[in-house]
Amino acid sequence: MDPISKFLVSYKIPIGAWGKAFFTFLTDNFNTVLRAFSNGLNFLLDGMVDGLLLLPPVLLIALIALLAYVLQRSKGLALAVFLGLLFILNQNLWKQTVETLVLVVAAAAASMAIGVPLGIWAAHKPKVYRIMLPVLDLMQTLPTFVYLIPVLTLFGLGNAPGLIVTIIFVIPTSVRLTHLGVTSVPKSIIEAGEAFGATKRQLLWKVELPSALPTIMAGLTQSIMLSLSMVVFAALIGAGGLGTEINRALGSRRIDLGLEAGLAIVVLAIVLDRMTRIGVGGKK
């Protein structure tokens, strides 16, 4: 090794040691609070799953198909949703699918609840967005497995850490697309609102957000798809659902189980994508 390389290696920046010290500090001083939060979140998620599983599967499938029709006004879509979910039930993966559905919906809802206000704020404050941008890039490019270690350390095993990891992974998408939607509103529309004496609050709620809604809804769809892509990773830290079946199939080399669970994830992804997409079934 050349002298310069030796020097650089000898004086390694202790990033790992700093990170370990930081998380050790958190666990030593806030472990009770963090575990209480995790247990509360686990209780809430488990309660949602148990509540949905109390319904007969066919009834719940019919209700989801009805919701698809209400959202998109498409009988064909409602029928496709009904048949797709019946296929999952036929594969004896209904309980796991409900667990995954709860995790995905909760993660997408939380990411939108956090990301949309941040995106609106960033759209009105360019300096804020310039500060956010490297953080968002880091959140999206950091390997998923790196998220699992600190979250597992802080929150333990269960659905709660799986949900937290998924939210962290998904938030950048909702922030970016909300920012894109608001900044893409034509200035002529905003100027027309100002000419009629609209306040900043009125401009936001009656001009900017309605114009940006298609892009924001695209952010919701992307958030759902990204949340689904995380189910296998979330299962590694105790989250249930279809990801657990995928990991079981991988560990035991069971092609049959992997194919069944994989197809169930695909069907669920298509169902959620079509139900939340603007413009399906003629809806505008």
Language-model region placement:
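N-terminal, non-cleaved signal-anchor transmembrane helix
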Residues: 1-102, 109, 282-284
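Alpha-helical membrane-interface segments at transmembrane helix boundaries
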Residues: 42-53, 94-102, 106, 129, ...
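Transmembrane-helix boundary motif in ABC transporter permease subunits
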Residues: 66-70, 88-95, 107-136
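Membrane-spanning helices that line or support transport/gating and their immediate boundary helices
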Residues: 96-100, 120, 131-134, 177-184, ...
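Generic hydrophobic transmembrane alpha-helix motif, especially the helices
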Residues: 103-106, 111-114, 123, 137-169
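Glycine-rich helix-loop "coupling/hinge" segments at transmembrane-helix boundaries
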Residues: 153, 182, 227-268, 280-284
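Transmembrane alpha-helices
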Residues: 164, 168, 200-234, 256, ...
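Short cytoplasmic-facing helical segments at TM-TM junctions of multi-pass membrane proteins
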Residues: 174-219, 246
